[in-house]
Amino acid sequence: MNKIRCALIGPGNIGTDLLYKLRRSDILEPVWMVGVEPSSEGLARARELGLKTTSDGIDGLLPHLEADDIRIAFDATSAYVHAEHSARLTARGVRVIDLTPAAIGPFCVPPVNLDAHIGSNEMNVNMVTCGGQATIPMVYAVSRVQPVAYGEIVATVSSRSVGPGTRRNIDEFTRTTAGAIEAVGGARQGKAIIVINPAEPPLIMRDTIHCLTDDAPDVAAITASVHDMIAEVRKYVPGYTLKNGPVFDGKRVSIFLEVEGLGDYLPKYAGNLDIMTASAARTAECIAAAMRAGSAQESANA
């Protein structure tokens, strides 16, 4: 069966790493890479890999959507331009996976709520943030056992792995992640902190998650839930590792993670970017599988 064809908007670190992951997919075919700088290294690399490219932004892509049968588009640009991109793409029937903090569509954290989004046929889903993808599964692992009054995460990332787009979006990062800790993670109140570490050599992404439960924590149930969720995330992020915990102190549950990347395009220390691209690829593959199943059902009914 033919692969589902995709476009990538934004040829920076995230867009380029995502391209490498999509090229390995059994169900997705990356066809277009869209940028705004003719001299972009990401566009040049995409051309070398056989993709069609444009430096005219989304205006350069739209006329080709139908002819090239683009069904899914990934937006790895900026929260400030995503609204326009999404409106123009979804109006043409293209499903959008948003890797910016814009959060126009509902938050998607694959092991927590991806199945629900596929069932509701959402046209735009938001991948939260790198910190959100790394930590929200842990908040949810606690909240699915018992109510969580407060969830706080600290994402520590290497300065080298944080590009200009992420730096411009720091405020959006913290707001979006905190909102998703509540909406997806299940905490009644959420807080997110990002620490950009300039250490050399660069450090692998580290995440700390603190949850305050309403009642005394069920140690055995929460520990089992956390380990089950670690295994789920490792299916698509093999470098997702529990370094310590869960640690229990009164009503506080603390979990300590490390996220190492696959090293597709980005260095392995850039696990913060790798978990975003891996989560987006996982989401798109599940959406594409649902598209295929729907097409097969239509053919059977014809």
Swiss-Prot record:
Q: Which reaction does it catalyse?
A: acetaldehyde + NAD(+) + CoA = acetyl-CoA + NADH + H(+)
- Which keywords, in A-to-Z order, does the entry hold? Aromatic hydrocarbons catabolism, NAD, Oxidoreductase
Q: Which SMART domains match?
A: Semialdhyde_dh
GO MF terms, alphabetically ordered: acetaldehyde dehydrogenase (acetylating) activity; NAD binding
Q: Does the keyword Disulfide bond apply?
A: no
UniProt xrefs under Pfam families: AcetDehyd-dimer
Residues reported to bind NAD(+) = S161, V162, G163, P164, G165, T166, R167, R168, N169, N272
Q: Does the keyword Cell membrane apply?
A: no
Where does the signal peptide begin and end?
Answer: none
- GO annotation terms (biological process): catabolic process
Q: According to its UniProt record, which residues of this chain constitute the active site? A: C130 (acyl-thioester intermediate)
EC number, UniProt record: 1.2.1.10
Q: Which Gene3D superfamilies does the protein's record reference?
A: Dihydrodipicolinate Reductase, domain 2, NAD(P)-binding Rossmann-like Domain
- What family is reported? Belongs to the acetaldehyde dehydrogenase family.
Q: Which HAMAP family match?
A: Ac_ald_DH_ac
**What's the protein called, per UniProt?**
Acetaldehyde dehydrogenase 2
